[in-house]
Amino acid sequence: MRTSQYLFSTLKETPNDAQVVSHQLMLRAGMIRPMASGLYNWLPTGIKVLKKVENIIREEMNKGGAIEVLMPVVQPAELWQESGRWNDYGAELLRFVDRGSRDFVLGPTHEEVITDLVRREVSSYKQLPLNLYQTQTKFRDEVRPRFGVMRSREFVMKDAYSFHVDKASLQETYDVMYQVYSNIFTRLGLDFRAVQADTGSIGGSASHEFQVLASSGEDDVVFSTESDFAANIELAEAVAVGERQAPTAEMQLVDTPNAKTINELVEQFNLPIEKTVKTLIVKGATEEQSLVALVLRGDHELNEIKAQKHPLVADPLEFADEAEIKAKIGAGVGSLGVINLNVPAIIDRSVAVMSDFGCGANIDGKHYFNVNWERDVAMPEVADLRNVVEGDPSPDGKGVLQIKRGIEVGHIFQLGTKYSEAMKATVQGEDGKPLVMTMGCYGIGVTRVVAAAIEQHHDERGIIWPSDEIAPFTVAIVPMNMHKSESVQQFSEELYRTLKAQGVDVIFDDRKERPGVMFADMELIGVPHMVVIGEKNLANGEIEYKNRRTGEKQMIAKDQLLAFLKENVKA
């Protein structure tokens, strides 16, 4: 491609409304342009990258035995009403009425459509397992679209859905898809972790997220220093450290009128924060136990996902207000504790191994110090309630935990029969009776993958694509003052024709621009291999080569250039 015949729309300045690096660089590199809130036009440079990512995903999905289909973006409301999600999905579901007064939605996902398709096309257990996928536009009416294509309203997604006779068959396909996803993100050159995750609004049982590690990520990713263990922070199991020690002092009731928070207690009484506990009051799951106490070490944070999964706790989690707490317990939130507590208590594992600790006395303005389990108060129920912290032991017993920010680019679920049961998607089983199909689903945010790659791989000059396979062009020919030098023009034209004939995705910068502008643009869009042709070097039989990823520069003999590029460039 010649730049003179290309829509090459780079920007020198960073737009003010672009907050994250990927948004800034995608705008500056001429990959995208905003049209409305959360809606983007993809320009030629952007669409080249997007299609290359799609092709890698398609190739690996096909290798894994999945079969490509294409389903409509517009979906009839009846399918969503049948699945039960018409009322449950919320405001992100864009609904509209056609001129025949029929309700439709703009699809945020395709579980209903694929289930309807398969129940019409598949009738026997002999046709299973079946794994169908598509790459299609989705729309979610985000309340606050932000970060460019990282969280836009319209986006491209690869979504796959598998159908099975039983859970064992689903597990086999799930394992295959786990490996397929690992292969995809490895081939894309991304530093990622596959983490245990919550199933969220999609539903189902087992679930893994594929997270690209990047400081701009919205999720906390927990992983071991010495094993493959990785989990979303909401699901990472917290292991108690150490064993409970014998008491060393008598319990004391202390006046603490000005200590209404853990930090104030620690500062005023010179207590180690890890020797304090805090008591949080939440709504209970039943009328008989309308309030429940959750007890954590003073320096630990409550994991709300873990808490609301406890049978005594209301789901969704809801904290009791000050008036409810005062009426039931007789003390304000700054003086709550485990002694003489008149509501059920659940203590975190880390609290269960504490000794000589401080806690509220359930009397306003008072705390107990040197409290010990069994001696001073009976041990309540113990559960995993907290978020893990860096340095915690890994739950698999191998290494310690690290926590980094991550961008979710893929998610796989074992749906079970959530949709097939609701929509009566059955086949004739081996015994001749109707059998409800078991389902899995597997999604990759294709547009988000592009942004995540940039978040993880860039420098002050622009994008550094982690793999030649997804760069918009693999080789840039940059002729210096070509329009003033016949030899430079002749060599550049010949090299361009040769590389094109060899199938190399090459961009030839034939603009009448200063060399500095040409270099800056090629580095900005992230072309991994740059061939710089100058009159003086050419006269000496040499060509300059620059590697965008390593920053390496070297002189290559003119007659060895094609062999060098063939060895170093993945066409």
UniProtKB/Swiss-Prot annotation:
Pfam families: HGTP_anticodon, tRNA-synt_2b, tRNA_edit. The keyword DNA-binding does not apply. It catalyses: tRNA(Pro) + L-proline + ATP = L-prolyl-tRNA(Pro) + AMP + diphosphate. It is found in: Cytoplasm. Disulfide bonds: none annotated. GO terms for molecular function: aminoacyl-tRNA deacylase activity; ATP binding; proline-tRNA ligase activity. One of its GO terms (biological process) is prolyl-tRNA aminoacylation. CDD domains: ProRS-INS, ProRS_anticodon_short, ProRS_core_prok. Its main location: cytoplasm. SUPFAM superfamilies: Class II aaRS ABD-related, Class II aaRS and biotin synthetases, YbaK/ProRS associated domain. Its EC number is 6.1.1.15. Belongs to the class-II aminoacyl-tRNA synthetase family. ProS type 1 subfamily. Consists of three domains: the N-terminal catalytic domain, the editing domain and the C-terminal anticodon-binding domain. Homodimer. Catalyzes the attachment of proline to tRNA(Pro) in a two-step reaction: proline is first activated by ATP to form Pro-AMP and then transferred to the acceptor end of tRNA(Pro). As ProRS can inadvertently accommodate and process non-cognate amino acids such as alanine and cysteine, to avoid such errors it has two additional distinct editing activities against alanine. One activity is designated as 'pretransfer' editing and involves the tRNA(Pro)-independent hydrolysis of activated Ala-AMP. NCBIfam families: PRK09194.1, proS_fam_II. This is Proline--tRNA ligase. The gene is proS.
